[in-house]
């Protein structure tokens, strides 16, 4: 296991859930269910309300692989929209192009999806894009660059991930033509997040 995998392993142990949605981290949690530095049935330290909010914020940050600045800006954008700020926050993060590439099974992880986008493999509405943080809207369409080796890679990824995750109801995927279409912005019940987004809203609201 390399250094990056070890770091991710410590994160899932700290949070107690597999935020990366990959089987290898389920195995780590099963083998070592306690946070790093704790052994057996050692008593957990009492966590303050701020501490709880910070943990939930970190879960979302590491789940989507965004920086502190990106998450802060996403929260500010979510506040501008009508509706529940926490729901808006998750909806915006879900509609990042790297996340959609991941959700569709075109990549085995969000980190891998970011690489795919950054390398110019993705065509959005007929134009090549290289920015993983682009937010998609209803009717936006994703295709793969016309190159046999790239399409072979994506089809291999789809095959590897097909049994590991459920396809979201808010996107439409054509596995034969390697197309993705955004049907609509996801509602809260269409987002399988593993964090309490309301605590994240409270975290940022106190620092506004």
Swiss-Prot record:
InterPro entries under this entry?
Answer: Ribosomal_uS4, Ribosomal_uS4_bac-type, Ribosomal_uS4_CS, Ribosomal_uS4_N, S4_RNA-bd, S4_RNA-bd_sf
* One cellular-component annotation, GO: small ribosomal subunit
The record ties this protein, via Pfam families, to: Ribosomal_S4, S4
Q: Which GO terms describe its biological process?
A: ribosomal small subunit biogenesis; translation
Subunit structure, interactors included: Part of the 30S ribosomal subunit. Contacts protein S5. The interaction surface between S4 and S5 is involved in control of translational fidelity.
* UniProt function note: One of the primary rRNA binding proteins, it binds directly to 16S rRNA where it nucleates assembly of the body of the 30S subunit.
Q: Which family does it belong to?
A: Belongs to the universal ribosomal protein uS4 family.
Give the PANTHER family listed for this entry.
30S 40S RIBOSOMAL PROTEIN, SMALL RIBOSOMAL SUBUNIT PROTEIN US4M
- Protein name, entry field: Small ribosomal subunit protein uS4
Q: Which gene encodes it?
A: rpsD
């Amino acid at each position: 296991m390399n250094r990056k995998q070890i770091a991710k392993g410590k994160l899932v142990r700290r949070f107690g859930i597999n935020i990366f949605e990959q089987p290898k981290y389920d195995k780590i949690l099963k083998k070592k269910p306690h946070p790093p530095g704790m052994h057996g049935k050692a008593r957990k330290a009492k966590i303050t309300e701020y501490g709880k909010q910070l943990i939930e914020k970190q879960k979302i940050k590491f789940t989507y692989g965004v920086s502190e600045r990106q998450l802060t800006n996403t929260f500010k954008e979510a506040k501008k929209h009508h509706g529940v700020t926490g729901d808006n926050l998750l909806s915006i993060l879900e509609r990042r192009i790297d996340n959609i590439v991941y959700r569709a099974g075109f990549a085995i992880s969000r980190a891998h999806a970011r690489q795919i986008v950054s390398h110019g493999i993705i065509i959005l509405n007929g134009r090549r894009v290289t920015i993983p943080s682009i937010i998609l809207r209803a009717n936006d369409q994703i295709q793969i660059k016309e190159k046999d080796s790239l399409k072979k890679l994506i089809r291999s990824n789809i095959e590897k991930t097909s049994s590991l995750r459920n396809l979201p109801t808010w996107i439409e995927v054509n596995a034969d033509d390697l197309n993705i279409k955004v049907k609509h912005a996801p509602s809260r019940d269409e987002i399988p997040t593993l964090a309490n987004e309301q605590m994240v809203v409270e975290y940022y609201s106190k620092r506004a």
